[in-house]
């Protein structure tokens, strides 16, 4: 996963830079979401990855998926990906693009994993602290993961704050076995 993200990041940055320059970040966002969903569809992906398909034919398939929403710039982007055998990266490119878009809008998407459901007050306290830490507006989504035992894991982009009992026990185990 990290390797795919590393490969996808330059493409996402280039797409975002171009879209920002053209004032078309939302159009590109929509196109990348549709393309990402298409690549994740098993039947479409199986057809797309047939060895006899040329990169140009692969791009034509995506043109059918996007229909009228496909601009020449998106077509050129798909051609670049197809020529470099990188169409499989579209979900990661779309995710990274959305992250860049959020950063540009001074917004950070945060996932809080908690061993127990958070109260509205706890969620608001965490949100306020995270907004102060990131100096941005924070959009919070909470996931309950009982396997953490206690505490929380906070994920914001590529940053992870792990204050879970599971993590602390794992560190203790490592020290004892060393």
UniProtKB/Swiss-Prot annotation:
Q: Which Gene3D superfamilies match?
A: N-terminal domain of the delta subunit of the F1F0-ATP synthase (1.10.520.20)
- Molecular function in Gene Ontology: proton-transporting ATP synthase activity, rotational mechanism
In the bilayer, the protein is annotated as: Peripheral membrane protein
Assembly and oligomerization:
F-type ATPases have 2 components, F(1) - the catalytic core - and F(0) - the membrane proton channel. F(1) has five subunits: alpha(3), beta(3), gamma(1), delta(1), epsilon(1). F(0) has three main subunits: a(1), b(2) and c(10-14). The alpha and beta chains form an alternating ring which encloses part of the gamma chain. F(1) is attached to F(0) by a central stalk formed by the gamma and epsilon chains, while a peripheral stalk is formed by the delta and b chains.
Q: Which organism is it from?
A: Acinetobacter baumannii (strain ATCC 17978 / DSM 105126 / CIP 53.77 / LMG 1025 / NCDC KC755 / 5377)
Instruction: Report the Pfam families cross-referenced here.
Output: OSCP (PF00213)
Any coiled-coil ranges, and where?
none
Listed A to Z, the keywords are: ATP synthesis, Cell inner membrane, Cell membrane, CF(1), Hydrogen ion transport, Ion transport, Membrane, Transport
> Mind telling me which InterPro entries this protein's record contains?
ATP_synth_OSCP/delta_N_sf (IPR026015), ATPase_OSCP/d_CS (IPR020781), ATPase_OSCP/dsu (IPR000711)
What role does it play?
Answer: F(1)F(0) ATP synthase produces ATP from ADP in the presence of a proton or sodium gradient. F-type ATPases consist of two structural domains, F(1) containing the extramembraneous catalytic core and F(0) containing the membrane proton channel, linked together by a central stalk and a peripheral stalk. During catalysis, ATP synthesis in the catalytic domain of F(1) is coupled via a rotary mechanism of the central stalk subunits to proton translocation. This protein is part of the stalk that links CF(0) to CF(1). It either transmits conformational changes from CF(0) to CF(1) or is implicated in proton conduction.
- The UniProt gene name for this protein comes to atpH
| Gene Ontology cellular-component terms listed | plasma membrane; proton-transporting ATP synthase complex
Protein family according to the UniProt entry: Belongs to the ATPase delta chain family.
Do the record's keywords include tRNA processing? no
Name of the protein this chain belongs to: ATP synthase subunit delta
Where is it chiefly localized?
membrane
The entry's localization annotation reads: Cell inner membrane
């Amino acid at each position: 996963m990290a390797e795919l993200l590393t490969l996808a990041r330059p493409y996402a940055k280039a797409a975002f830079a171009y879209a920002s320059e053209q004032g078309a970040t939302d159009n590109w966002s929509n196109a990348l979401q549709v393309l990402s969903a298409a690549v994740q569809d098993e039947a479409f992906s199986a057809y797309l990855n047939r060895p006899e398909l040329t990169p140009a034919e692969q791009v034509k398939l995506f043109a059918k998926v996007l229909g009228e929403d496909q601009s020449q710039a998106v077509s050129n982007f798909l051609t670049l990906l197809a020529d470099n055998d990188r169409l499989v990266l579209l979900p990661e490119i779309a995710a990274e693009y959305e992250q860049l878009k959020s950063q540009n809008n001074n917004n950070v998407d945060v996932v809080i994993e908690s061993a127990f459901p958070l109260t509205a007050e706890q969620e608001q306290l965490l949100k306020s602290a995270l907004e102060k830490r990131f100096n941005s507006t924070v959009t919070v989504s909470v996931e309950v993961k009982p396997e953490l035992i206690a505490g929380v894991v906070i994920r914001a982009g590529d940053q992870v704050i792990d204050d879970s009992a599971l993590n602390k026990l794992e560190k203790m185990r490592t020290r004892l076995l060393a």
